[in-house]
Curated annotation (Swiss-Prot):
Record has Ribosomal protein as a keyword: yes
Annotated protein name in UniProt: Large ribosomal subunit protein uL18
Gene: rplR
Organism: Edwardsiella ictaluri (strain 93-146)
The keyword Cell cycle is annotated on this UniProt entry: no
UniProt family annotation: Belongs to the universal ribosomal protein uL18 family.
GO CC annotation terms, alphabetical: cytosolic large ribosomal subunit
UniProt keyword terms in alphabetical order: Ribonucleoprotein, Ribosomal protein, RNA-binding, rRNA-binding
Amino acid sequence: MDKKSARIRRATRARRKLKELGATRLVVHRTPRHIYAQVIAPNGSEVLVAASTVEKAISEQLKYTGNKEAAAAVGKAIAERALEKGVKDVSFDRSGFQYHGRVQALADAAREAGLQF
């Protein structure tokens, strides 16, 4: 089993549990160059809000889009957008990525900006 298939296996297990709970999910995906976040409705088929370092508004503020500062900017942006939509409580879906580094920075920034998980 390679690294990617192991990550996908972990993500599938976590998502199955979150689906049973019927929770609104804050989903994170990372690549070496960018980080993406989406808030997905409990039915799993509707993206309520999204933010990423690909967006011009966020990437213009940053020197580099693949570090913790960029992840924190995305976390703050996703929290502000979710609160505007009326979403306050979410479940954090780390997509099988280790809760460390950029994933943790995004989560901490989202919590500081007002999301609860």
